[in-house]
């Protein structure tokens, strides 16, 4: 289920403050955040946001195709190493 349009997109208040400060100050330093649930807004375009994936902050450069998605979609939390190979199938 998607979010109601009358409610509007959700963005954490502390992230909004950091983005506004970065845009006003023309700061190119990545913005660190743990807020994976925040929606990407058009104001974020051109910024680099370091999104926490549970272990480290993954830098995500925001472009216009990402608007409307959540920040957590671009910082993967699970690492797939592959299934164990079957020894009989290799021969």
UniProtKB/Swiss-Prot annotation:
Protein family according to the UniProt entry: Belongs to the universal ribosomal protein uS19 family.
Keywords: Ribonucleoprotein, Ribosomal protein, RNA-binding, rRNA-binding
Pfam family, any one: Ribosomal_S19
Gene Ontology terms describing biological process: ribosomal small subunit assembly; translation
Protein name per UniProt: Small ribosomal subunit protein uS19
Molecular-function GO terms, alphabetical: rRNA binding; structural constituent of ribosome
Keyword Lipid biosynthesis tagged: no
Known role: Protein S19 forms a complex with S13 that binds strongly to the 16S ribosomal RNA.
Gene Ontology CC terms, in alphabetical order: cytoplasm; small ribosomal subunit
């Amino acid at each position: 289920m998607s979010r109601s349009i009358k409610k509007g997109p959700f963005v954490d208040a502390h992230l909004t403050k950091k983005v506004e400060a970065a845009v006003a100050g023309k700061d190119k330093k990545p913005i660190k955040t743990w807020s994976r649930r925040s929606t990407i807004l058009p104001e974020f375009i051109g910024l680099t946001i370091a999104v926490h994936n549970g272990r480290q902050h993954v830098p995500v450069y925001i472009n216009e195709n990402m608007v409307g998605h959540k920040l957590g979609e671009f910082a993967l939390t699970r690492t797939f190493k592959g299934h164990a190979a079957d020894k009989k199938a290799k021969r």
